């Protein structure tokens, strides 16, 4: 008896193995972290490499408020974000932070530096800590995108409709209210 192979054994492993982006800086970073992932036995470099290879929608932005909340309990660590660090106007005082990210918005950079913190690039981070010691990997919420609100197609998932207008006549009746036949 043979084993039942899905698609006759031609199933590829998930996840990207190569960078799709044409960004030369990103290409250099991938080259650097491929080398480090191969030569060091620490999972930090493998995780950073995996996240660098991800599509842009998985490099979600992280606000300064969330960043500072995560770093409260780790005052001497460097926050590593494979994505963008954005400013948050609701935050009055930014604590002293050490941040390494692919991109940092202009306002966020000014606020971090004004509080006595530092903003590092990935090559500076590698020079300082090649095995990821005293580093905390953080990521933004990938499901917070506007597009994701339209995807909920499970039962009672309440997906957001694509409508040209939000008036009385537009996708407000059948299937949306119990009083109009049924509510999905």
From Swiss-Prot:
Its main location: cytoplasm. One of its GO terms (cellular component) is cytosolic large ribosomal subunit. Keywords: Cytoplasm, Ribonucleoprotein, Ribosomal protein. It comes from the Eukaryota. Pfam families: Ribosomal_L18. One of its GO terms (molecular function) is structural constituent of ribosome. InterPro entries: Ribosomal_eL18, Ribosomal_uL15/eL18, Ribosomal_uL15/eL18_sf. It is found in: Cytoplasm. Residues 156-184 are annotated as: Disordered. One of its GO terms (biological process) is translation. Residues 174-184 have a biased composition (Basic residues). Belongs to the eukaryotic ribosomal protein eL18 family. This is Large ribosomal subunit protein eL18. The lineage of its organism: Eukaryota, Sar, Alveolata, Apicomplexa, Aconoidasida.
């Amino acid at each position: 008896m043979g084993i039942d192979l899905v698609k006759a054994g031609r199933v590829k492993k998930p996840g990207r193995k190569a960078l799709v982006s044409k960004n030369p800086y990103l290409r250099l970073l991938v080259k650097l972290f491929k080398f480090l992932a191969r030569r060091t036995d620490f999972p930090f470099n493998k995780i950073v490499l995996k996240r660098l290879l991800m599509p842009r929608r998985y490099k979600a932005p992280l606000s300064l408020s969330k960043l500072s909340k995560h770093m409260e309990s780790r005052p001497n660590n460097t926050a590593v974000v494979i994505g963008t660090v954005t400013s948050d106007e609701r935050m009055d005082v930014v604590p002293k932070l050490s941040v390494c990210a692919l991109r940092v918005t202009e306002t966020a950079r000014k606020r971090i530096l004004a509080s006595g913190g530092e903003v590092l690039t990935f090559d500076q981070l590698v020079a300082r800590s090649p095995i990821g010691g005293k580093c905390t990997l953080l990521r933004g919420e990938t499901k917070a995108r506007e597009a994701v609100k339209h995807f909920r197609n499970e039962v009672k998932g309440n997906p957001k409709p694509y409508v040209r207008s939000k008036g009385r006549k537009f996708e407000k009746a059948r299937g949306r209210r119990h009083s109009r036949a049924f509510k999905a």
